[in-house]
UniProtKB/Swiss-Prot annotation:
This protein is one of the early assembly proteins of the 50S ribosomal subunit, although it is not seen to bind rRNA by itself. It is important during the early stages of 50S assembly. This is Large ribosomal subunit protein uL13. One of its GO terms (biological process) is negative regulation of translation. It comes from Shewanella baltica (strain OS185). GO terms for molecular function: mRNA binding; structural constituent of ribosome. InterPro entries: Ribosomal_uL13, Ribosomal_uL13_bac-type, Ribosomal_uL13_CS, Ribosomal_uL13_sf. Gene3D superfamilies: Ribosomal protein L13. It comes from the Bacteria. Part of the 50S ribosomal subunit. The keyword Ribonucleoprotein applies. One of its GO terms (cellular component) is cytosolic large ribosomal subunit.
Length: 142
């Protein structure tokens, strides 16, 4: 019997919507990363993007455990000397709550062109509304 290998033409992608209200950041991010890669499918192939589209709503209501709300720090660098910036979880949640889930999921995806293609299938919204109703997403309970 020949081993099955998925090709981009044979991959079928579904749309799922995930509600992050009251969910723990790491636990929801790992499940999203698995679904974006397509590892939940029997036709998973490591070198082909077999994952689904994921819409995350209520990103502003995601939680972290322990003292991470105050102690967790996100860093970015401009590329210039002395250009490092840091922001705490609490401030980032108030300013750009979508970025918290995006950074957590992006770190769990492969680095390179395939990982960037997988990351493009993630749509994160701070509130409960999203503009992907035409795709008829299914509710994914995590």
């Amino acid at each position: 019997m020949k081993t099955f290998t998925a090709t981009p033409e044979t991959v079928t992608r579904d749309w799922f919507v995930v509600d992050a209200d009251g969910k723990t950041l790491g636990r929801i991010a790992t499940e999203i990363a698995i679904r974006l890669r397509g590892k939940h499918k029997p036709e998973y192939t490591p070198h082909v993007d077999t994952g689904d589209y994921i819409i995350v709503v209520n990103a502003e209501k995601v939680t972290v455990t322990g003292n991470k709300a105050k102690g967790k720090t996100y860093y970015s660098h401009s590329g210039f000397p002395g250009g490092i910036k840091q922001i705490s979880f609490e401030k980032l949640q108030a300013q750009k709550p979508e970025m918290i889930i995006e950074k957590a999921v992006k770190g769990m995806l492969p680095k390179g062109p395939l990982g960037r293609a997988m990351f493009r299938k993630l749509k994160v919204y701070a509130g409960a509304e999203h503009n992907h109703t035409a795709q008829q997403p299914q509710v994914l309970d995590i």
